[in-house]
Amino acid sequence: MKYNNHDKIRDFIIIEAYMFRFKKKVKPEVDMTIKEFILLTYLFHQQENTLPFKKIVSDLCYKQSDLVQHIKVLVKHSYISKVRSKIDERNTYISISEEQREKIAERVTLFDQIIKQFNLADQSESQMIPKDSKEFLNLMMYTMYFKNIIKKHLTLSFVEFTILAIITSQNKNIVLLKDLIETIHHKYPQTVRALNNLKKQGYLIKERSTEDERKILIHMNDAQQDHAEQLLAQVNQLLADKNHLHLVFE
């Protein structure tokens, strides 16, 4: 799939598809959420014994409320400790002892192994896929950051944006709903809801085939095609701008 030669968009969607497959495969097999693995990876590679909670929120693209919940779990299982500043009790810090750092290191090593084993089974040929937990963290934050960019600049969800990118890459800009579902790497209800939203906003046309009413066609007219191309070019430029690149670790 060419995505109309928008290389950064192609890379972005490849990464997101990889993350989707990874979560679907790994989530049932481990006793820790992916977010908790990522949080431990972040804390491990910071190599600091005390970190302000505000810095963690700033570096990671998760909602603050989500981070609070995951930190509670990690505190409960003695991976980290949470302390309040003696100067200002409103400021919270995450503290890590040497014993806890060793415990975290074991989990990060396990995460590295999980990623390598998944990559062997997945057999993706893309150069974008992460080789270890540190790269996984960076790519996860990269995709989350740009999902926010897309939502802010285009007022589209990531699924809606992906649908536009896929349809404009097809010959004659026509795709079967069945093929779109298989390509997009998102849940069926989520994809259909996004399609209906795009149709309602006038981005595309969704109709039954006149040759076979069991088939649903998704396509665009010339004006819709031009508008979608402009949006894709805008996002591709944002993705190519190094100033927008959100990496936790260089």
Swiss-Prot record:
<dbReference type="InterPro" id="IPR039422">
    <property type="entry name" value="MarR/SlyA-like"/>
</dbReference>
<dbReference type="InterPro" id="IPR055166">
    <property type="entry name" value="Transc_reg_Sar_Rot_HTH"/>
</dbReference>
<dbReference type="InterPro" id="IPR036390">
    <property type="entry name" value="WH_DNA-bd_sf"/>
</dbReference>
<keyword id="KW-0804">Transcription</keyword>
<dbReference type="InterPro" id="IPR010166">
    <property type="entry name" value="SarA/Rot_dom"/>
</dbReference>
<dbReference type="InterPro" id="IPR036388">
    <property type="entry name" value="WH-like_DNA-bd_sf"/>
</dbReference>
<dbReference type="GO" id="GO:0003700">
    <property type="term" value="F:DNA-binding transcription factor activity"/>
</dbReference>
<dbReference type="GO" id="GO:0005737">
    <property type="term" value="C:cytoplasm"/>
</dbReference>
<dbReference type="InterPro" id="IPR000835">
    <property type="entry name" value="HTH_MarR-typ"/>
</dbReference>
<keyword id="KW-0678">Repressor</keyword>
<comment type="function">
    <text>Transcriptional regulator that controls expression of some virulence factors in a cell density-dependent manner.</text>
</comment>
<keyword id="KW-0843">Virulence</keyword>
<comment type="similarity">
    <text>Belongs to the SarA family.</text>
</comment>
<keyword id="KW-0677">Repeat</keyword>
<keyword id="KW-0010">Activator</keyword>
<protein>
    <recommendedName>
        <fullName>HTH-type transcriptional regulator SarS</fullName>
    </recommendedName>
</protein>
<keyword id="KW-0963">Cytoplasm</keyword>
<keyword id="KW-0805">Transcription regulation</keyword>
<dbReference type="GO" id="GO:0003677">
    <property type="term" value="F:DNA binding"/>
</dbReference>
<dbReference type="Pfam" id="PF22381">
    <property type="entry name" value="Staph_reg_Sar_Rot"/>
</dbReference>
<dbReference type="GO" id="GO:0006950">
    <property type="term" value="P:response to stress"/>
</dbReference>
<keyword id="KW-0238">DNA-binding</keyword>
<feature type="DNA-binding region" description="H-T-H motif">
    <location>
        <begin position="177"/>
        <end position="200"/>
    </location>
</feature>
<feature type="DNA-binding region" description="H-T-H motif">
    <location>
        <begin position="53"/>
        <end position="76"/>
    </location>
</feature>
